[in-house]
UniProtKB/Swiss-Prot annotation:
The lineage of its organism: Eukaryota, Viridiplantae, Streptophyta, Embryophyta, Tracheophyta. Pathway: Protein modification; protein lipoylation via endogenous pathway; protein N(6)-(lipoyl)lysine from octanoyl-[acyl-carrier-protein]: step 2/2. [4Fe-4S] cluster 2 binds at residues 143, 147, 150. This is Lipoyl synthase, mitochondrial. Residues 25-34 have a biased composition (Polar residues). It holds the Pfam family LIAS_N. Belongs to the radical SAM superfamily. Lipoyl synthase family. The keyword Cell wall biogenesis/degradation does not apply. It catalyses: [[Fe-S] cluster scaffold protein carrying a second [4Fe-4S](2+) cluster] + N(6)-octanoyl-L-lysyl-[protein] + 2 oxidized [2Fe-2S]-[ferredoxin] + 2 S-adenosyl-L-methionine + 4 H(+) = [[Fe-S] cluster scaffold protein] + N(6)-[(R)-dihydrolipoyl]-L-lysyl-[protein] + 4 Fe(3+) + 2 hydrogen sulfide + 2 5'-deoxyadenosine + 2 L-methionine + 2 reduced [2Fe-2S]-[ferredoxin]. It comes from Oryza sativa subsp. indica. InterPro entries: Aldolase_TIM (IPR013785), Elp3/MiaA/NifB-like_rSAM (IPR006638), LIAS_N (IPR031691), Lipoyl_synth (IPR003698), Lipoyl_synth_mt (IPR027527), rSAM (IPR007197). [4Fe-4S] cluster 1 binds at residues 112, 117, 123, 359.
Length: 382
């Protein structure tokens, strides 16, 4: 226990990027909202200026979600500036253009675009390994949930799934010549099977066209339905991924109210139980949401106890002003400490860094090597 407290304290010292701030006198509320508002000693504003102020207040008023977050977690008056290590690459290149054109042609969606992933340019263009990758998003581009970190569109009644989507996705992926693909989806609480049948069909059709391809399915929680989990876990995939997104203590502040930590852990346990031997399980969390090092360590311990093989850590990036603010920018040194700790805990692979995302190209490269090594061992044993 003493060692864990020491590690948490060490992480806390390296954790936060905190630029200096100047302190100035505090103006009145109306002066803060409208710099042209006179001081209390001056004459009262005209009716026209009052009407203008009311319009500004209405336009800038926080949503109920923003108000709730400000009470529960706390917000900053100004967004934190990005530190030097949070640099994004501008997308480009022939492979990038080719993948984007094919996606538009078949009316397919990627989480890379919908979630504004900072690694989109690297993954689509091939990056260091030369193999282009993309994370395909099925079941449409509209989610039935409204997590406070996610930029995907939401609706209680999204359009019905395209029955041709499994075939279109399989054909598109097969034509790209990839070795490893990630298939994910929005939440579809409106469907009787939560979309699990559509998911399984997509994997199965792809296996027919490209039997040698390694497939990772990054799935929603299916409301914890064991039958839905089993349907996807036994569809022929190699990696069953489901993200817990944040530490246990911040679940209600970060995720939709229909999601929770226990339900996600149970989904990962069920996947390990139902999937064929050798199938890897994987999860991911964002840092910079207000968590403490001790909470991260505790969450890692519970994830590992659920039998999860792979865990990734990345920096939360606010997609827009409508989403929850970044609490802090976690330093690369702190990310490295979490990676090292994860390896010590027994995770087979840990990807941890500011720009890492759950579907991360470098991680997929190492996971592919792990799967091939497991296959080689199994063949030798036979």
């Amino acid at each position: 226990m003493h060692g864990r407290r020491h590690l948490a304290a060490s992480l806390a010292r390296a954790l936060t990027y905190a630029p200096s701030r100047s302190i100035s006198s505090t103006p009145s509320l109306l002066q803060t909202l409208d710099p042209s508002t006179p001081s209390p000693a001056a004459a009262p504003p005209t009716a026209g200026r009052l009407a203008e102020l009311r319009q500004r207040l209405q336009a800038d008023a926080p949503s109920l979600g923003d108000f709730t977050y400000s009470v529960e977690v706390g917000t900053r008056k100004k967004p934190l500036p990005k530190p030097k290590w949070m640099k994004e690459t501008i997308p480009g290149g022939a492979k990038y253009a080719g993948i984007k054109a094919k996606l538009r042609e078949l009316k397919l969606h990627t989480v890379c675009e919908e979630a504004r992933c900072p690694n989109l340019g690297e993954c689509w263009s091939g990056g260091e390994t030369g193999t282009a990758t993309a994370t395909i998003m099925i079941l449409g581009d509209t989610c039935t949930r409204g997590c406070r970190f996610c930029n995907v569109k939401t609706s209680r009644t999204p359009p019905p799934p395209d029955p041709d989507e499994p075939s279109n996705v399989a054909q598109a992926i097969a034509s790209w010549g990839l070795e490893y693909i990630v298939i994910t989806s929005v939440d579809r609480d409106d469907l009787p099977d939560q979309g699990s049948g559509h998911f399984a069909e997509t994997v199965q059709k792809l296996k027919v066209l490209k039997p040698e391809m390694l497939i990772e399915a990054l799935v929603p929680d299916f409301r914890g339905d064991p039958a839905c989990v089993e349907k996807v876990a036994t569809s022929g995939l190699h990696v069953f991924a489901h993200n817990i997104e944040t530490v246990e203590e911040l679940q209600r502040n970060v995720r939709d109210h229909r999601a929770n930590f226990k339900q996600s852990i149970d989904v990962l346990k069920l996947a390990k139980e139902y999937a064929p031997a050798g199938t890897l399980t994987k999860t991911s969390i964002m840092l910079g949401c207000g968590e403490t090092p001790d909470q991260v360590i505790s969450t890692m311990e519970k994830v590992r106890a659920a039998g999860v093989d792979v865990m990734t850590f990345g920096q939360y990036m606010r997609p827009s002003k409508r989403h929850m603010p970044v609490s802090e920018y976690v330093t690369p040194e702190a990310f490295e400490r979490y990676r090292s700790l994860g390896v010590d805990m027994g995770f087979r692979y840990v990807a941890s860094g500011p720009m890492v995302r759950s579907s991360y190209k470098a991680g997929e490269f190492y996971i592919k090597a792990m799967i091939e090594a497991d296959r080689a061992k199994a063949t030798t044993a036979i």
